[in-house]
Amino acid sequence: MSIKQWPEGERPREKLLERGAAALSDAELLAILLRVGTRGMSAVDLARYLLQEFGSLGRLMSAEVGKLSAYKGMGTASFTQFAVVREIGRRILAEELQESIVLSDPDTVADYLRFHLGQEKVEVSVALLLNRQNQLIAVRELSRGTVAENTIYIREIVKLALDEYADSLIIAHNHPGGSPEPSQEDIMFTRRLAQAMSLVDVSLLDHFIVTSQSVCSFRQLGLMP
C-alpha cells in the first residue's frame, strides 16, 4: 500500500504538520527525506529497511556513495541529500554552541564533538578556542589524515590560540573505528601542549577522544596536567 492510501493522520508529512517533527520515528523522518520508495515498498518501508541494514540513522547518513548505491532506489542523489542534512545539522549545532554564554557543561561539548568527528573515516584533530568567560570563539581543524600522517605541531596550536586571542582551548581528535581510550602518546602530547600553553597564559581545559559511539574526556579521567 502506498503512503497516499494511508489514513491522513498516519502519513509522515501530515503527521509532522499536525504533531511536530519530534512525534515522528526515525523511519518516518527519513521517509520524508527519501520522498519515494521502490516497487512494492513505500518510502517508510524503504526507510525501515535501510535503518535495519545500516544499524542507525547516523551510520546511514554518513555512508559512502558506493555503499548507498548498492541498495535499490539509492544513489548519488540520496548521498547528496544526506551529506547536506549532516552539514546543516553540524552548522546549526556549531552556531548553538558558539552562542552559548558559557561552555560549563562537558556533555554539550561532547555531543558537538561526536557529531563533528564521530563519523569521520580518517583521524581528524580540532581545537575549540574560548574566551575568558569560556564562550566559544572559533573551531579550527588542526590536522586530517591517517594516524601515521596526522601530525600536530604544538607551536602551531600556540600560534593559533594567540592569533584568535583565546584565553583557553579544548582539543579533540577521533579514533576512526577504534576505542576512545587515550594512548600513551595522547597523554604525553597533552602534557607537552598544556605546558606550552601555560607559557603564553592560555589554559588547556580538556582533551577529548571521539568515536562514533562514545567520547572520552581527559579531565574526567584525571589525565589533565
From Swiss-Prot:
Coiled coil: none annotated. Residues 102-224 form the MPN domain. Keywords: Hydrolase, Metal-binding, Metalloprotease, Protease, Zinc. It comes from the Bacteria. InterPro entries: MPN, RadC_JAB, RuvA_2-like, UPF0758, UPF0758_N. A motif (JAMM motif) lies at residues 173-186. One of its GO terms (biological process) is proteolysis. GO terms for molecular function: metal ion binding; metallopeptidase activity. PROSITE patterns: MPN. The keyword Hydrolase applies. Zn(2+) binds at residues 173, 175, 186. Belongs to the UPF0758 family. This is UPF0758 protein NMB1038. It comes from Neisseria meningitidis serogroup B (strain ATCC BAA-335 / MC58).
